[in-house]
Curated annotation (Swiss-Prot):
ATP binds at Q85, G103, E104, G105, K106, T107, D493. It comes from Streptococcus pneumoniae (strain ATCC BAA-255 / R6). It catalyses: ATP + H2O + cellular proteinSide 1 = ADP + phosphate + cellular proteinSide 2. Part of the Sec protein translocase complex. Interacts with the SecYEG preprotein conducting channel. Has a central role in coupling the hydrolysis of ATP to the transfer of proteins into and across the cell membrane, serving as an ATP-driven molecular motor driving the stepwise translocation of polypeptide chains across the membrane. The gene is secA. Its main location: membrane. Its cofactor is Zn(2+). GO terms for molecular function: ATP binding; metal ion binding; protein-exporting ATPase activity. It is found in: Cell membrane; Cytoplasm. Keywords: ATP-binding, Cell membrane, Cytoplasm, Membrane, Metal-binding, Nucleotide-binding, Protein transport, Translocase, Translocation, Transport, Zinc. Belongs to the SecA family. This is Protein translocase subunit SecA.
Length: 837
């Protein structure tokens, strides 16, 4: 039933008839545009932009805009888009994929939808697989866009943030897929809005769309955090400090299994790490290491919560079964803190600060389309994951290429012997040959064989894109022999040299079948472009990977019975069997990518929430007091609710400790202040007192701008720190739930549930840290420049505390320990001249 519906809904012939009618409407403007002067034609761009701003849709501008581009291309490039190219352009504008054969002019096809969508002023990204193609297409097609009055930018990895920003501000931006991804991630790590380089993702037109959205779909783009050596040192430093504490230096809340430093513990930390104030914004990272070291040393118990294996690894003990949980690690840096405690090697020190897969990157665009010569085989995946249809576009001229049936040999050796003989025979008559391989090693092997056979040739291994294009451009010349890995040279046409058509055109030889039919079709498509003659022939052996996986044993018996060790089997049935095997592999790969997406969707939803809130903070030109005060309120509520079932004395003591060490000035609240109050009244009492402390803290900042700056940096530093740990934790969770699949549990469902719980825990942790830092930070006039320093260098830089000079006539006994030192150093008195008392 599903297949019948699919046939009805996606009737390609009906779609092509509709596109032909739309293309005819574009052609009706041909004479009108041809009659315009250059200046009149260029002025159309301004006219279209104004019409769009006045409410006309891009769809209604399509016919005239496409006609303008056709005429412009004729005048500037000497190229006049065919009807099939106009049809392809319409498909691209509608956010789908036109399947256009190699040599049908995909680059020119793209100019029409790119121009049309650039009129909105929201930006168009033309995405390519390498920087050579970005620069080539931007240079060649940029000439047309610039002539028509649109700005064109090229985004390269080597460009500075300012240059990247300029490139993204252009109407049309050429870039590789990876650079767009990394720029997106980096934009969501900056502290200032002006340091972001991208605009909101609007329209992407992806060249070689199958390569980027299918083959590389699972590739994660990763921005790593602090380096391993630095973080490893911090774990050890924090552990050493925590081990030096006395029982009075920390407070344990047994019920919630939490631990924090007492006043004396804070004093010792500030002395040990030579800090002015442990809870300054600068020290977010260090407090995180100390918190974990406290938990590792005084809450997590050896042989109860974890064991140390013979391989010197920390293994978590399942509290219900008593068994160790292979592959599972504590999140949030706790596992590393335990490793430091037990003196075993610290693992996973390099953290992922941000990551995204291409699947989720490109699904963020408002509109996504792409071009390929071979997309129909992956149509189901394009539709399911990206909501994109694949529409085959007819060729401008009929395909003349002859595709021979596969030749199957018993061994790899006999196969390659036949390949070399075939190449040599064609070389001797002058017919150009392109030999496609699946691996660099195969290319080198065939190259040696051809050298021995006296056949001059070029080898292309996709190592140098600039050299690659030159070799591919010459591959259609008389007598040219080129060996290339399958992906090499995509995006560059092979044009036939003089006299080659009479010899049968370019012959493409495949040395084995790829597990994807699409890659084989791409290789075939190198020959027979734009109605040129050509041939394709695949050579297979029973020892090829694909044949080994599917049914080579039965065929092996046939070869042995017929004694055909050097001869080949050729039949259409064999070709069909190979394609059936490829379909099975493609199905497996599709299922794998789909499962990866299910996992990644959990991260995507969480990332979008964090990045949206982060963007709101960065771009806010307002006082963020309501947001911070709401965090303080929720933190108080969590703490009080977390002790609701405890005995009254224990509950009040725990809440009091929380208030004293995280919320209010030391000794400003006592047990008597809270006793006799209901939980609701306790929450309100603490919140009202906290608001006074908040007002006192911000009043120390010199002006409204300094307050905004302080609020932003405070929130962003905490969020970034916690988010980095959370990404790490999700990675570890994913590895762990994979093992649960063996216990009849659905790992994806478990990952979703556990990931959701961890996300909520992270939000609570963010709000707790923001509360603690806001209330306990020592704020002084130097706060603003301090806040702009980068957090990752904090703990290692705050080593030497210098002493400033003190007025001679001052009575030091009159100064409180936690007041600012009168010497003007900005430190607390106890950490400065008070040390001498």
């Amino acid at each position: 039933m599903a297949n019948i519906l699919k046939t009805i809904i996606e009737n390609d012939k009906g779609e092509i008839r509709r596109l032909e009618k739309m293309a005819d409407k574009v052609f009706k403007y041909e004479d009108q545009m041809a009659a315009l002067t250059d200046d009149q034609l260029k002025a159309k761009t301004v006219e279209f932009k104004e019409r769009y701003q006045n409410g006309e849709s891009l769809d209604s501008l399509l016919y005239e805009a496409f006609a303008v581009v056709r005429e412009g291309a004729k005048r500037v490039l000497g190229l006049f888009p065919y009807k099939v190219q106009v049809m392809g352009g319409i498909v691209l504008h509608h956010g789908d994929v036109p399947e256009m054969r190699t040599g049908e002019g995909k680059t020119l096809t793209a100019t029409m939808p790119v121009y049309l969508n650039a009129l909105s002023g929201k930006g168009v990204h033309v995405v390519t697989v390498n920087e050579y193609l970005s620069e080539r297409d931007a240079t060649e097609m940029g000439e047309l866009y610039s002539w028509l009055g649109l700005s064109v930018g090229i985004n390269l990895a080597t460009k500075s943030p300012m240059e990247k920003k300029e490139a993204y501000e252009c109407d049309i931006t050429y870039s590789t897929n990876s650079e767009i991804g990394f720029d997106y991630l980096r934009d969501n790590m900056v502290v200032r809005a002006e340091n972001m380089v991208q605009r909101p993702l609007n329209y992407a037109l992806v060249d070689e769309v199958d390569s980027i959205l299918i083959d590389e779909a699972r590739t994660p783009l990763i921005v790593s955090g602090a380096n391993a050596v630095e973080t490893s040192q911090l774990y050890h430093m924090a552990d050493h400090y925590v081990k030096s504490l006395n029982k009075d230096d920390y407070i344990i809340d047994v019920q919630s299994k939490t631990i924090g430093l007492s006043d004396s513990g804070i004093d010792r930390a500030e002395s040990y790490f030579k800090l002015e104030n442990l809870y300054d914004i600068e020290n977010v990272a260090l407090t995180h290491f100390i918190d974990n070291a406290l938990r590792a040393n005084y809450i997590m118990l050896l042989d109860i919560d974890y064991v140390v294996s013979e391989e010197q690894e920390i293994l978590i003990v399942d509290q219900f079964t008593g068994r160790t949980m292979e592959g599972r690690r504590y999140s949030d840096g706790l596992h590393q803190a335990i490793e430091a405690k037990e003196g075993v090697p610290i693992q996973d020190e390099t953290k992922t600060s941000a990551s995204i897969t291409y699947q989720n990157l490109f699904r963020m665009y408002k509109k996504l389309s792409g071009m390929t010569g071979t997309g129909k085989t992956e149509e189901e995946e394009f539709r399911e994951i990206y909501n994109i249809r694949v529409i085959p576009i007819p060729t401008n001229r009929p395909v003349q290429r002859i595709d021979h049936s596969d030749l199957l040999y018993a061994s790899i050796e006999s196969k390659f012997k036949a390949v070399v003989e075939d190449v040599k025979a064609r070389y001797q008559k002058g017919q150009p040959v392109l030999v496609g391989t699946v691996a660099v090693e195969t290319s080198d092997y065939i190259s040696k064989k051809l050298v021995a056979a006296g056949v001059p040739h070029e080898v292309l291994n996709a190592k140098n894109h600039y050299r690659e294009a030159q070799i591919i451009m010459n591959a259609g010349q008389r007598g040219a022999v080129t060996i290339a890995t399958n992906m090499a040279g995509r995006g560059t046409d092979i044009k036939l040299g003089e006299g080659v058509r009479e010899l049968g055109g370019l012959c493409v030889i495949g040395t084995e079948r790829h597990e994807s039919r699409r890659i084989d079709n791409q290789l075939r498509g190198r020959s027979g472009r734009q109605g040129d003659p050509g041939e394709s022939q695949f050579y297979l052996s029973l020892e090829d990977d694909l044949m080994k996986r599917f049914g080579s044993e039965r065929l092996k018996g046939i070869f042995e019975r017929l004694n055909m060790s050097e001869e080949a089997i050729e039949s259409r049935m064999l070709t069909r069997q190979v394609e059936a095997a490829q379909k099975r592999v493609e199905g497996n790969n599709h299922d794998t990518r789909k499962q990866v997406l299910q996992y990644d969707d959990v991260m995507r939803e969480q990332r979008e929430i964090i990045y949206a809130q982060r963007y709101d903070v960065i771009t806010a030109d307002r006082d963020l007091a309501p947001e911070i005060q709401a965090m303080i309120k929720r933190t108080i509520e969590r703490v009080v609710d977390g002790h609701a079932r405890a005995k009254q004395d224990e509950k009040l003591e725990a809440i009091l400790n929380f208030a004293k060490y995280n919320l209010l000035p030391e000794d400003s609240i006592t047990m008597e202040d809270l006793s006799g109050l209901s939980d609701k009244a306790i929450k309100e009492e603490l919140f009202q007192r906290a608001l006074k402390v908040y007002d006192s803290q911000v009043s120390k900042l010199r002006d409204e701008e300094a307050v905004k700056e302080f609020q932003k940096v405070l929130i962003l530093r905490v969020v970034d720190n916690k988010w980095t740990d959370h990404i790490d934790a999700l990675d570890q969770l994913r590895n762990a739930v994979g093992l649960r699949g063996y216990a009849q549990n659905n790992p994806v469902v478990e990952y979703q549930a556990e990931g959701f719980r961890m996300f909520n825990d992270m939000i609570g942790s963010i709000e707790f840290d923001v509360t603690r830092l806001m209330m306990k930070a020592q704020i002084h006039e130097q706060e603003r420049p301090q806040a702009e320093r980068h957090i990752s260098t904090t703990a290692t830089r705050n080593i030497a505390a210098h002493q400033a000079s003190m007025p001679e006539d001052l009575d030091l006994n009159q100064i409180g320990r936690n007041e600012l030192c009168p010497c003007g150093s900005g430190k607390k008195f106890k950490n400065c001249h008070g040390k001498r008392q």
